[in-house]
Amino acid sequence: MLHTLMNEAKAVVVDIGGFTADYLLMNNGKADLSSCDSLENGVILLYNKIRSRGNAELDLLLDEGDVDAILTGKQTQYPPSVVRLVEQLAQEFVNDLFSTLRERMLDLRYCTVVFVGGGAILLRRQIEAYGKVGKPLFVSNINANAAGYEYLYRLEAAGR
């Protein structure tokens, strides 16, 4: 995947984690540190919103495992109304995140977007359904960040 990004005129890496969603713009394979930030848009906010609305509107006590099962398309015992609510709120979460990125002058329609992090894996269907991401790539390895840091460490250590 690194070779793919090196040949792209413009790419954005979006890491959707528990507490934050981080992004980094890459131009011609090089990080543009003037266009990177950490947004307080992690999936824990989504879990809390789903649990709150589920309790208020449907008198349900959903936990994170329930939400994960619904969002990953696993068979659950929940009625269609619960599944619809969870998927609707997840789609709104993704739409809001991408609107925030657009406000920061990142138009995802015309670039490669690499999605990493557990939140990106969880929300893959909603990200793909958004329909305004030019070329989405998903890193499904939950340990990709650690592997990347290990790679950078080895490069740094070899240079000493």
How would you name each of these model-derived features?
Residues 2-8, 43-160:
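Helical "lid/coupling" subdomains associated with nucleotide-phosphate turnover
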Residues 15, 37, 140:
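Conserved acidic E/D residue at the C-terminus of a beta-strand in Rossmann-like folds
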